[in-house]
């Protein structure tokens, strides 16, 4: 088994996190870092420490370069690394502008090197299962996505690069791309219309943003991100409305959630494959009355169901039970996060070894999410 040698450009908190989890892999060795910060040399338990990233990408021992820098540097570094014969795992977003992203795509095509972007939430077991459910059509179409993301800003001083939109692209580009990508993966749909709004706390900090995205098969998605409070209030929910189900997922790195769905035996079997699935309620549809309208309004059941089908958006489904349940991963947030970054690096390695292997997140996928982020940022 070949051991792939990895170099990391950018050795802040996330660079260290990647190193911590990648060094646990038998087929990977992190041999070099490049960081422009002033760190005591003893901070680095690593073979090679560069203070100029050009030296790292020209290191002939390195197979894969991981780029973990402010987003405005991504395109230049990724293109240079590929031209130097290195495969690349690029931190999200792929870039901050359409032009830079297109340059990365062009360079990949010219060099033939493997590159993807670290949208590692695609490797989360909960998201993977709901992607599969979406592809199978088990729950009908995904009609609405609502993301509410309340993030802490305690570690983000007013002069942090995160607030500098020339460096980060702004919240929707630096952070929102994760959730645009999740909706793209869950639905398999393409955006057609994008709108954005925002609030500025002051001249330096645009701290609350929102976007609405309309997709080609009817999905409407709403995204809200606020970097404006203490860590105690940090919370992310992802709500999904399918024809046959209502789902609420908790955590920007999804860890648990709940679902209510109308099912038949086949669909119920597919729900059992969701990690940590536990049924909390199960009722025959024939025993449930539709109480969506108040008493005295009249019988509302006849317009929704027949003896054989239940209708959503004019489409009939053969279902006979209403099921509610919960799901939850057994690991901690850090463990789930760590396994996701291990999985994406192993995905890149599989692609290096087998060009026919399909990455779970492609450069084209990352470009699609970035374009939604760019458009929503321009329209705000």
What do these predicted ranges mean?
Residues 1-44:
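N-terminal Rossmann-like dinucleotide-binding module
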Residues 1-3, 8, 64-66, 288-380:
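C-terminal helix-rich "cap/oligomerization" subdomain common to oxidoreductases
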Residues 18, 47-107, 340-343:
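Beta-loop-alpha module in the N-terminal Rossmann-like domain of NAD(P)-dependent dehydrogenases
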Residues 90-91, 115-117, 223, 249:
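Hydrophobic residues in well-ordered beta-strands that form the structural core
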Residues 103-120, 140-145:
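Rossmann-fold dehydrogenase core element
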Residues 121-203, 209-213, 220:
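Predominantly a Rossmann-like dinucleotide-binding segment in NAD(P)-dependent oxidoreductases
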Residues 174, 181-301, 345-351, 374-376:
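Contiguous beta-strand/loop segments that form the cofactor/metal-binding neighborhood of enzyme cores
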């Amino acid at each position: 088994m070949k051991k792939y040698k990895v170099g990391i450009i950018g050795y802040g908190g996330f660079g260290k996190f990647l190193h911590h989890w990648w060094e646990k892999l038998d087929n990977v060795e992190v041999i070099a870092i490049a960081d422009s910060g002033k760190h005591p040399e003893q901070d680095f338990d690593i073979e090679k420490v560069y203070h100029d990233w050009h030296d790292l990408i020209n290191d002939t021992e390195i197979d894969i370069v991981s780029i973990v820098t402010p987003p405005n540097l991504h395109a230049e570094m990724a293109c240079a690394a590929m031209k130097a014969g290195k495969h690349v795992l690029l931190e999200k977003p792929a870039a901050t502008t359409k032009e830079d992203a297109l340059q990365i795509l062009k360079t990949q095509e010219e060099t033939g090197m493997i590159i993807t972007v670290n949208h590692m939430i695609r490797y989360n077991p909960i998201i993977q299962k709901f992607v599969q459910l979406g592809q199978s059509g088990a729950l009908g179409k995904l009609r609405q996505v609502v993301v509410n993301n309340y993030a802490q800003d305690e570690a983000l001083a007013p002069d942090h690069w995160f607030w500098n939109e020339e460096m980060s692209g702004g919240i929707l580009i630096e952070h929102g791309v994760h959730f645009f990508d999740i909706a793209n993966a869950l639905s398999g749909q393409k955006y057609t219309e994008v709108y954005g709004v925002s609030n500025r706390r002051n001249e330096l900090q645009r701290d609350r943003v929102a976007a609405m995205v309309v997709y080609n098969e009817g999905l409407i998605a709403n995204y809200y991100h606020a970097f404006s409070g203490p860590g105690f209030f940090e919370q992310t929910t992802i709500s999904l409305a399918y024809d046959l189900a209502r789902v609420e997922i908790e955590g920007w790195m999804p860890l648990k959630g709940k679902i209510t769905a109308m099912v038949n035996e086949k669909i119920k079997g597919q729900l059992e494959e969701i990690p940590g699935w536990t049924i909390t309620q199960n009722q025959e549809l024939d025993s449930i009355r539709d109480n969506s309208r108040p008493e005295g309004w009249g019988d509302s059941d006849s317009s929704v169901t027949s003896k054989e089908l239940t209708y959503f958006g004019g489409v009939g489904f053969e279902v006979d039970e209403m099921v509610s349940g919960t799901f939850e991963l057994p690991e901690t947030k850090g463990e789930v996060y760590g396994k996701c970054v291990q999985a994406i690096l192993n995905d890149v390695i599989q692609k290096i070894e087998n060009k026919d292997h399909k990455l779970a997140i492609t450069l084209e996928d990352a470009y699609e999410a970035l374009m939604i982020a760019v458009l929503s940022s321009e329209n705000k």
